[in-house]
Design a protein with these regions (language model features):
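A catalytic-pocket lid/entrance helix-loop region that shapes and gates access to the active site
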Residues: 131-184
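Short beta-strand/loop motif that positions the catalytic acidic residue
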Residues: 260-261, 267-269
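N-terminal cap/lid segment of alpha/beta-hydrolase-fold proteins
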Residues: 8-30, 236
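Conserved alpha/beta-hydrolase "acid-adjacent" motif
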Residues: 274-280
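Conserved acidic catalytic loop of the alpha/beta-hydrolase fold
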Residues: 92-110
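Catalytic active-site module of serine/aspartate enzymes centered on a nucleophile-bearing elbow/loop
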Residues: 291-324
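Conserved HGGG/HGGXW glycine-rich cap/lid loop of the alpha/beta-hydrolase fold
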Residues: 24-82
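Conserved hydrolase catalytic core segment
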Residues: 108-147
């Protein structure tokens, strides 16, 4: 990282110029929106979680004069319906939805941008639809391996944030703490809304308190909203107990070896990312020679930390220079 250069900042806020709801099954409707230049370089920005939903800030990583910016709320979250729904909700359905949106909007190929779980989904899409990907921009790489889930939700990150971890495990009795993800899942799928929300708040707060090393750790406002934390925690936990719905542990990294050849990409990762440690980005780079790995010395996991913002925008600008 060149610390002497001026860091790029988010582009000014831009409003969606059109939006809609796409029926993707008898059960699910997906909210989508477009911003920026209708004739620009298409990009789909994938939100995290899963279950996090899109936000207006996600549009601001792209030059609206040069990009056709597509956002969508994945199944069960944001403005998609039914809300917090776990049925028909898995990685492969989300990839099908991406293809449905692409076809609905008449896009042949697009840049795929995603952070955290968004990087997981972006990679899964790229290895199954490489002919539809112009380039990848990934942040906070998460390969959804058991070791990554155990690090953050069971044993690892607790040594760095023992205070926050104590609050996280509070809803779970001592005799169930040997498998916290399963214990949370039982509560997050309970019919008792009070019990479900108590668990959801603890789950979301844990992630919210460990996102950033920049200044005081202030949770994003939506981490205080009951509807948000309900969907966020339920859907995340649903994917984690099911191993991301991949065939085997480590499937994504194995598929990336070879199948990403020829796809240009940038991986941006905070040196002190506690949520998704740097190991996964490092291992991904080893099997993806066309990728450029940017390690940010003064950043954690959040997409809004200054060093992360700078490199993400530089990566997106570079793709626009090349393809727009």
């Amino acid at each position: 990282m060149n610390v002497s250069r001026t860091r790029k900042k988010l582009y000014p806020p831009v409003e969606a110029r059109r939006s809609g709801n796409l029926t993707v099954s008898d059960l699910h409707e997906i909210y989508w929106e477009e911003a920026g230049n209708a004739s620009g370089l298409p990009v789909i920005a994938l939100h995290g979680g899963p279950g996090g939903g899109s936000s207006p800030e996600m549009r601001r990583f792209f030059d609206p004069r040069r990009y056709r910016i597509v956002l969508a709320d994945q199944r069960g979250c944001g403005r998609s319906t039914p809300f917090s729904e776990l049925r028909e909700n898995d990685t492969w359905k989300l990839i099908e939805d991406m293809e449905s949106i692409r076809e609905h909007l008449g896009i042949e190929k697009w840049v795929v941008f995603g952070g955290s779980w968004g990087s997981t989904l972006a990679l899964a899409y790229a290895v199954t639809h490489p002919d539809r990907v112009i380039g990848l921009v990934l942040r906070g790489v998460f390969l959804l391996r058991r070791s990554e889930i155990r690090w953050f939700y069971q044993e690892g990150a607790n040594h760095l944030y023992p205070d926050a971890f104590e609050r996280y495990v509070a809803p779970i009795p001592e005799d169930e703490r040997h498998d916290l993800v399963s214990a949370f899942y039982r509560r997050l799928t309970s019919d008792d809304r009070t019990e479900r929300l108590k668990a959801a708040r603890a789950w979301a707060q844990w992630e919210g308190e460990t996102l950033s090393i920049q200044g005081p750790r202030v949770r994003p406002p939506r981490f205080e909203e009951d509807d948000f934390v309900d969907a966020f925690a339920r859907i995340e936990c649903h994917y984690f107990v099911n191993g991301g719905f991949f065939e085997e542990d480590g499937w994504l990294l194995k598929q990336a070896a070879g199948k990403l050849n020829g796809i240009p990409g940038t991986i941006v990762h905070g040196r002190y990312d506690v949520v998704t440690p740097l190991t996964s980005a490092w291992e991904l780079k080893k099997v993806w020679p066309d990728a450029d790995l940017k390690i940010i010395a003064d950043a954690g996991h959040s997409s809004l930390e200054p060093g992360i913002v700078d490199e993400l925008i530089r990566a997106c600008d570079s793709l626009a220079d090349r393809y727009a």
